[in-house]
Amino acid sequence: MIDLRLEEDILTATLPEFLTTRPKYRYAYTNTKQQDLRLLGPMRHVRLTHLYKHTKLWNLQYIERELTNIEIDDALDEFMQTFSLPYTIEQGTYKYNMLLGMHAHNIGYQDDVSELIANNPQLLNYLNDNPLASIFELIDIDLQIYQYGQNIFNNEVEHMILFLKDNTYHGVIQALQKHPFSATHVTWHLHKHIFVFHSREKLLNKLLATGLEDSQLYQRQKTYSTKRGDRPTERMITYIEDDHIRRIQAVLPLLLDNIFDVKLHRDSSMTWLKSYADTIYDSAKNSDSTVTPEIRKLYLRMYNQYMRVFLPIEQYMLYDTTCWPFSEKITLKINVRLISSRENQPVSWKTPIDTENLISIVQPDNPINKLNFTAVPSTMIRLNDNIMMYRSVKDMFAAIEYIPDSDENIPTIEMKEQALSRYISPDSEAQNFFNNQPPYLNSIINVNKQVFEAVRRGNIQVSTGSAEHLCLCMYVKSGLIVGRTVLIDDKVILRRNFNASTAKMITCYVKAVTQLYGEGSLIYPGLRIVFFGVETEPAMDVLKLFYGDKALYIQGFGDRGIGRDRFRTKIEDALTLRIGCDILISDIDQADYQDPSEEKFDDITEFVCYLTELVISNATIGLVKISMPTYYLLNKISQNINNKFSKVNINIVKLSTQKPYTYEAYLLLSHGSTLTTKGYAKNPVCDVYLEQISLQPQEIKIISTISNEINYDKPTLYRLVVDKNDITDVSIAMHILSIHCSTIITRSVMVKNDNTGAFVTMSGMKDMKRVAIMNRMTDGTNENAYMYEDNGKLYLQKVPYLEDLVNAFPNGFGSTHQNDYDSSTSVINVNALVRQVVYRVISKSIPVALLESLSRIRIVGGRDLGEMNAVYKLYKTPVEVYDTVGITREYPHVQISYRAQRYQFTESIPNHTLLLANYVIMNDIDRAPISSAEQINTIKKIISKIGVGSIAYVQVYTDVVARHINVMTKNDSFLISANADKTVFKVQVSGYKAVEMCNYEQLLQLVSDNTGVHIIKLTYQDVLESCVLSSGILGDTGSWLLDLVLASTYIIEIRG
């Protein structure tokens, strides 16, 4: 499909001519005597603002008769003489981003992005097919574009298009979940985006309108007259859990033939659709004869799976991998009959943080714990922890490889004592808990499934020997038709015995063949591969299917187990056959934690040294699992191998298909080393393992009664049930939840047939940032009248009164449904998690002695107030935020002032000030990267300017680990690169411009030269604590990038 919106964008060289040419238009004089003038092409985005009230075009809307073509043409000609857009002409094929240019014009250059454009119109010029790339290099937020009515005389905002900074499917899903009245198409012009509406009604009307548009598109598709740029379907996806919207979304695919034939006005068609959705829902629920059993079953599935798009064959055949990833073909349709309409309106509330006009004097005057609340069980609402985790094919076989970092490979006594102490200590239960969460394995299976479905539909062609081909073989047991491309036979049989270990083994294979032969096909006829520690590993069947009729020698030896004695015989027996191979992969576990002792430890160490020697003796390249990656073990292996062989590479590898919190690593063994370094002294994989952690997982705490205690120490779901008819109890419960939760979901619960049995369930997950902000509330006297402390614990003294929540009560509370649930967990990417860790470490590092003496908090670059997580204990201390994005304003009720200006590090830091400068000193305000030397100089300025009793925390990225990376897969999360002589290292984080990492030795020198300056390193303990408290599960990048990101992120503490 071709992007029609891109085709509307014109060459910058032709923009002057465009701005003097009268636009095409459509005109009508409506039955209500209103002028309706709609400009076509790029000019349809123009908003006729009050700046043009003196033009003829403005005054046309007030004429109470039908206009002539001459009047309209004359008015448009005059308008084009006054209309302008910011631009810079560039010759060649540079195009002009018309949508963004029009947006800046329409709002009078009043937002931050429009100001950037006004100052530098060249940002609107682009090559290729990504017109937003330049803008997203300068901003780290989603891009908001307002859309107005098609009639140029309608200046009201209809909705907002939100172009997403996270330009992935996962980013779209997160945005839909964040914005309650939002939807997205199944394909995206320009860049992935969603549509955000101001109300449920506007969202519903949009979904109905696109349903009607889809019926017309469907008629064209049936006659094979689809136009360039047509989507497979015009219907949209929404994540709002609204009963009536789900009814409508579920019935639309079944009515595409019928809706087109209903010759009604659009409003009448929408009313009819709303009514008919109720009819089908009742029929399906009650199993009456209105619909067949097959349609009933399909309808209920579509109702419950509202995030999936269901397509008739004509639309399904146009679907490809660039579309919304969750789709299904249907073959059924239903006939139509009409009944009366009714609607149900569930409510999802976003509680306000902008408190300027929303908080009034506290009510009631009594402490919360003296109020009486009615509580009833709400067992209808289950707690769901099996959330979706997403990954792509390109990330499926990612890996990072570290080289030795020390000239010496001597396993010292200190190293042994450290390793033995760690061996005797049990693993963290919290780590084991997170590793065994179902989303991890499901995400791997889902990638394979998506490739399978795309091939079966004919939407993609998969080349033989490609990564996609390998994904198919992990999903299919038999039934692939392999030629130049791979097809799927009708009698295909799916694989049932796929597990997490299989995915690791396949990723080991990919790493090994890429190391041997470079990038390209993953099939090499005649390859010889051996697995140790397995005899019937499914990975062997996967590779046999992958190779098909091409020659492959593959064999496995040994059952899975622990220790030397169980394996030595089987492996030695195998080697008596003189098996020489290209690749040898060992998946033998070595950690025996039953009755650990020094004797067992020595036995394991000896066995692993023996095993690695066997591998490199019999293979060109080997990968050996290391269950306990300690400096002692790695140097012992290095010493043993280097004493017996010459020029052997012994590198540490982490794989993307390992469990996200795993300790284990793989040793990559190969011949031909040119390194002078042989040992390990500071590797992040070893550092993480050697931490001794005894952290227990915490089950989510469900609070179902009113409590005034503020709890920071447990993941908490608040679920309150109150009498729906008692407005006082309802109001107070809602306000209590608004202190703890950024989102509240309400549901009506009827336990009797009369109003005496009407209750409302209110639920929401604790949001730490929300709590930290709302705890700061005052009543306007600069005294925190809401909080009090007792024995080190915080309690709410009174309830804040949030006006907007009470005003929304008439909209209804919604109701429960069959698959209703509260989600207890969320997926978090590695950078977002480490940012949480930074805040947590800072909060623990602030000296207790300073908590009472600090008079202000300064946050640099804190537009999203994330740093509030770091200062939640300082809820009485005023906050000053400095960020160039946004507008200057005061939030007096929460003691926060926002200053839209650049913070000058040359300014003196007042006495008794806490300064937070996280994720800012490596970029200028225009997002231009700053060198390591300049970053060090900024820290020196802070040191020289810090006042008495003040303290500063500055986050930096250091190159201490980057210099020891041999190879890492390109990725969108944390990508490190180096200059030619590997003296300067850069990191690209989450798609931003690559920035220089601070030189490690210069940081050490900085600490040495200045008293009161310390380096704080992040620990794995901090990671697990953050995950436990937030109920966040690390995404697929965790397994191979977490160690690296942790070791590369330092906090510099500066005390005055």
Swiss-Prot record:
Signal peptide: none annotated. It is an enzyme of class 2 (transferase). It is found in: Virion. It catalyses: a 5'-end diphospho-ribonucleoside in mRNA + GTP + H(+) = a 5'-end (5'-triphosphoguanosine)-ribonucleoside in mRNA + diphosphate; a 5'-end (5'-triphosphoguanosine)-ribonucleoside in mRNA + S-adenosyl-L-methionine = a 5'-end (N(7)-methyl 5'-triphosphoguanosine)-ribonucleoside in mRNA + S-adenosyl-L-homocysteine. Keywords: ATP-binding, Capsid protein, GTP-binding, Methyltransferase, mRNA capping, mRNA processing, Multifunctional enzyme, Nucleotide-binding, Nucleotidyltransferase, Outer capsid protein, S-adenosyl-L-methionine, Transferase, Virion. Its EC number is 2.7.7.50, 2.1.1.56. InterPro entries: Reov_VP3_bridge (IPR048605), Reov_VP3_GTase (IPR048608), Reov_VP3_MTase1 (IPR048607), Reov_VP3_MTase2 (IPR048606). The keyword S-adenosyl-L-methionine applies. Pfam families: Reov_VP3_GTase (PF20790), Reov_VP3_MTase1 (PF20831), Reov_VP3_MTase2 (PF20832), Reovirus_bridge (PF20830). Its main location: virion. This is Outer capsid protein VP5. It comes from Aedes pseudoscutellaris reovirus (isolate France).
